[in-house]
UniProtKB/Swiss-Prot annotation:
<dbReference type="GO" id="GO:0015086">
    <property type="term" value="F:cadmium ion transmembrane transporter activity"/>
</dbReference>
<feature type="transmembrane region" description="Helical">
    <location>
        <begin position="85"/>
        <end position="105"/>
    </location>
</feature>
<feature type="transmembrane region" description="Helical">
    <location>
        <begin position="331"/>
        <end position="351"/>
    </location>
</feature>
<feature type="transmembrane region" description="Helical">
    <location>
        <begin position="148"/>
        <end position="168"/>
    </location>
</feature>
<keyword id="KW-1133">Transmembrane helix</keyword>
<feature type="transmembrane region" description="Helical">
    <location>
        <begin position="226"/>
        <end position="246"/>
    </location>
</feature>
<protein>
    <recommendedName>
        <fullName>Uncharacterized membrane protein HI_1728</fullName>
    </recommendedName>
</protein>
<dbReference type="GO" id="GO:0034755">
    <property type="term" value="P:iron ion transmembrane transport"/>
</dbReference>
<keyword id="KW-0812">Transmembrane</keyword>
<keyword id="KW-0472">Membrane</keyword>
<feature type="transmembrane region" description="Helical">
    <location>
        <begin position="271"/>
        <end position="291"/>
    </location>
</feature>
<dbReference type="GO" id="GO:0006828">
    <property type="term" value="P:manganese ion transport"/>
</dbReference>
<feature type="transmembrane region" description="Helical">
    <location>
        <begin position="38"/>
        <end position="58"/>
    </location>
</feature>
<dbReference type="GO" id="GO:0005384">
    <property type="term" value="F:manganese ion transmembrane transporter activity"/>
</dbReference>
<keyword id="KW-1003">Cell membrane</keyword>
<dbReference type="GO" id="GO:0005886">
    <property type="term" value="C:plasma membrane"/>
</dbReference>
<feature type="transmembrane region" description="Helical">
    <location>
        <begin position="365"/>
        <end position="385"/>
    </location>
</feature>
Length: 397
């Protein structure tokens, strides 16, 4: 019974860890901004991105778990040193985004208690560190992610209900959009399963001892659940923002996602949004640190033996940089652009591994999953490549 309970908790915990890692301050801002631009047609973008997210994540999680190896080890088996390259991209991207996550947590406590954002960032960093000071850090991380995810969705759902969004119109344009923005699709897919995010849950399952072909049903369920949890938050926030925008309310350009909360609850709405952005940010801090370090553990035995200390160091560095330097905009933009390449590169390596018996044994990867995976690789590679070329051109102009 204990083993069954442990597996169920691990499967649920992995889903919430991945989902709450995706729901960070950038997730909230992007959702509000695109809703303001595309209005009800943003529902179509969300729907399409959900399908692409599921296609990408199912491929990655199933192959990682059936092989019993972390993504960097699979990559090294496919191409020598490819795992080191992937790990470098993940860690750079994870650190850059974690600086933003710590900043978001600081802003959240500033909205709730009125303390300085820098002090809020330090307090949030300490709270995240406390989890990894305990021996049962994995279980605490799972439970914390579940609690924060529940709080975020419930508060945002309340705000959505109060803004009275045009649900019928949103549902209609989710299938028949008036306009389509390819950049919005790429941004949503990259923000949900890009970078370190999709590997958070897969590596968590491995750490919980869930691996092998016999675990495929659990893994598929956890993988899809993670996408649906993150997407539920996006849909609810989309409708909340659509509710105020459809009434002619202009979004606050400094913090667009906060607008529906203020519309519903006035000044207290800032406190409500503070709770949401803090929960979103601090869980992303934890997810980014945990997953980034998980990409180094098998490449360096010293890190494996002192994993929690390295996770704590990762959080400390992110917090110190935020407090002393702030958000180094140029670095964040550049690393964020590189981060867009992680999904097509990592997914391509994982898909190549699916046909290597020395990696997956006798496992037969479903053809339709492989097809959907390669489709995501091609689309994301093209659009991410265009973004990087545009960035380099603007840098030298």
């Amino acid at each position: 019974m204990a083993s069954i309970t442990h597996r169920r908790n691990a499967v649920l915990g992995a889903a919430f860890l991945m989902a709450t890692s995706a729901i960070g301050p950038g997730f909230l801002t992007q959702t509000a901004t695109f809703t303001n631009t595309l209005l009800a047609s943003f529902g179509f973008v969300i729907l399409l991105s959900i399908l692409l997210d599921i296609g990408a994540q199912l491929n990655i999680w199933r192959i990682v778990i059936v092989s019993g190896k972390r993504a960097q080890d699979i990559s090294n088996a496919v191409f020598p040193k490819a795992g080191y390259f992937l790990a470098a991209l993940i860690v750079m991207g994870g650190l850059a985004f974690n600086i933003g996550n710590v900043g978001g947590a600081g802003l959240g406590l500033n909205s709730i208690f009125g303390i300085a954002p820098e002090m809020g960032a330090v307090i949030s960093g300490i709270i995240a560190i406390l989890i990894f000071l305990r021996k049962e850090a994995g279980l605490l991380m799972d439970r914390f992610a579940q609690l924060m995810g529940f709080i975020m969705v419930v508060l945002t759902f309340y705000v959505m209900f109060k803004t009275e969004p045009p649900v019928v119109e949103a549902a209609y344009h989710s299938f028949i959009p008036e306009q389509i923005d390819p950049i919005a699709i790429v941004t949503l897919v990259g923000g949900t399963v890009g970078g370190y995010i999709t590997f958070a849950g897969a590596h968590r399952l491995l750490d919980a001892g869930i691996q092998g072909e016999k675990a495929m049903a659990e893994v598929s369920r956890s993988s899809v659940s993670a996408i649906l949890i993150a997407s539920t938050m996006r849909v609810v926030l989309f409708l909340a923002v659509l509710g105020v925008v459809s009434k002619g309310v202009s979004l606050n350009p400094k913090n667009p996602a906060e607008t529906p909360f203020e519309y519903v609850a006035g000044n207290f709405g800032q406190v409500l949004f503070g709770v949401v952005i803090w929960a979103a940010s601090v869980t992303s801090v934890i997810g980014a640190a945990y997953t980034s370090v998980s990409f180094l553990t098998t490449l360096c035995p010293t890190i494996e033996r002192n994993r929690n200390r390295w996770i704590i160091a990762f959080i400390v560095i992110s917090t110190v940089v935020l407090v002393t330097v702030g958000k180094p905009a140029a670095v964040l933009v550049f690393v964020g652009t590189l981060n867009g390449l992680i999904l097509p590169i990592a997914l391509a390596l994982i898909l190549l591994a699916a046909y290597r018996s020395d990696i997956v044994g006798t496992y037969k990867h479903p053809v339709f999953l492989a097809f959907s995976g390669w489709f995501v690789v091609i689309i994301m590679a093209i659009l991410s490549g265009k973004t990087i070329i545009s960035y380099i051109s603007s840098f030298f102009s």
